[in-house]
């Protein structure tokens, strides 16, 4: 009887300890820079949407499109491609990209804009609607939001970007 109680007490202690370990490994709240949209003002994307693709290489990513036709991918490479608002079209072309690659040597670098000489292709990815956010934590915790007035913003750890007609920026 005493052994049974001792075993039950050990199991209970191990369960509580395991629970604390899980909680302590949860991602910390991402620090948002000034003028970054308030993530709490957006609602989670509907659970019935599938922000994935069936091809094998895409299993570690989430994909979505915005109402204004920007195509985004979240994962070890996070990027959005399209007619990005707030960028000079003569400098970046009709299909610009904002991205960050999460390779070992670039982990501490901010996102960047890249020009493209090609037109953007169509996408069938599920839409992320105005007022919605999508958080993807498979590789690196990334949250993207879509707001009114062609606003798209993503944050991944201490880096991210804001796309908006009044001026897009990266950090």
Segment roles from a protein language model:
Residues 1-31:
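Secretory targeting and sorting signals
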Residues 62-65, 80, 134-136, 153-156:
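Generic recognition of long tandem-repeat/solenoid scaffolds
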Residues 32-54, 76-130, 161-171:
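A low-complexity, Ser/Thr/Gly/Pro-enriched, surface-exposed linker/loop concept
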Residues 115-152:
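Acidic, glycine-rich flexible loop segments
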Residues 59-86:
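Short, surface-exposed binding/anchoring microloops in extracellular/periplasmic proteins
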Residues 140-171:
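Extracellularly exposed regions in secreted/surface proteins, prominently low-complexity, repeat-rich
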Residues 48-59, 64, 135-138:
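A cross-kingdom feature marking solvent-exposed beta-strand/loop segments within repeated
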């Amino acid at each position: 009887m005493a052994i049974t109680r001792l075993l039950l007490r050990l199991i209970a202690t191990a369960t509580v300890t395991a629970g604390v370990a899980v909680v302590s490994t949860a991602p910390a709240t991402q620090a948002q820079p000034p003028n970054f949209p308030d993530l709490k003002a957006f609602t989670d994307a509907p659970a019935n949407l599938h922000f994935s693709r069936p091809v094998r290489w895409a299993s570690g990513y989430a994909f979505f499109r915005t109402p204004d036709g920007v195509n985004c991918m979240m994962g070890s490479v996070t990027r959005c491609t399209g007619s990005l608002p707030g960028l000079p079209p003569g400098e970046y072309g009709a299909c610009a990209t904002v991205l960050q690659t999460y390779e070992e040597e670039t982990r501490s670098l901010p996102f960047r804009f890249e020009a493209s000489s090609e037109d953007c292709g169509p996408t069938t990815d599920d839409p992320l609607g105005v007022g919605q956010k999508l958080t993807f934590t498979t590789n690196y915790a990334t949250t993207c939001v879509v707001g009114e007035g062609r606003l798209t913003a993503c944050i991944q750890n201490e880096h991210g970007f804001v796309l908006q007609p009044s001026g897009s920026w990266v950090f």
